[in-house]
């Protein structure tokens, strides 16, 4: 999945307005224009779509954590230059104040049944022997589960 698609899915799953996305960036001490957010959210087939970089998505996710959980005193975390699906899943889990059991419940909503041990493998450090790489499909399923949990009457996100 592209960063643009991930941002669109997050927006759809949590029913976020563009202004709320801009506010998340502000919480990470970065200002983005409404036009830039709108261009990130456009379908990749649209010529005015602007490709979102890993670092930009990392800034959004860090700001989203601050927005949802409260900003910590002191220096803000530096945004990662390269993001993995595992990092994105972890940041979303933190922002949404979820424990491993909550993630399992969200995945169960979309028919994915994992054990606590299996889900824990996605939250380990990459050099851990039990680390498991989060594939696009699992991240997509997680976001669909979040959507159906937060917006039970919504339809599956298709684009």
Label each region the model flagged.
Residues 20-70:
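Acidic (E/D-rich), amphipathic helical modules within compact regulatory domains
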Residues 76, 154-159:
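Long, low-complexity intrinsically disordered regions enriched in Ser/Thr, Asp/Glu, Pro/Gly
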Residues 62-113:
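Short, solvent-exposed interaction modules
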Residues 3-13:
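Leu/Val/Ala/Ile-rich N-terminal alpha-helices, chiefly Sec-type signal peptides and the beginnings
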Residues 2-5, 83-87, 137:
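Alpha-helix N-cap/N′ positions at the starts of helices
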Residues 10, 16-28, 35, 40, ...:
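A structural feature that tracks compact, well-ordered secondary-structure segments
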Residues 49, 53, 81, 131, ...:
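Residue-level marker of regulatory loop/turn positions in helix-turn-helix DNA-binding domains and
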């Amino acid at each position: 999945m592209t960063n643009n698609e991930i941002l669109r899915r997050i927006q759809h799953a949590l029913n976020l307005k563009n202004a709320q996305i801009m506010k998340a960036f502000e919480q990470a001490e970065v200002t983005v224009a409404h036009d830039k957010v709108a261009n990130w959210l456009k379908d990749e087939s649209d010529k005015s779509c602007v490709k979102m970089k890993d670092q930009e998505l990392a800034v959004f996710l860090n700001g989203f954590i601050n927005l949802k959980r409260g900003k910590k005193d002191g220096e803000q975390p530096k945004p990662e230059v390269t993001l993995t699906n595992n990092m994105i899943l972890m940041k979303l889990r933190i922002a949404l104040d979820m424990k491993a059991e909550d993630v399992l419940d969200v995945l169960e909503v979309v028919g994915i049944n994992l054990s606590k041990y299996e889900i824990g493998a996605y939250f380990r450090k990459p050099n851990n022997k039990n680390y498991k790489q989060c594939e696009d499909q699992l991240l997509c399923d997680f976001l669909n589960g979040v959507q159906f949990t937060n917006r039970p009457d919504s339809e599956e996100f298709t684009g």
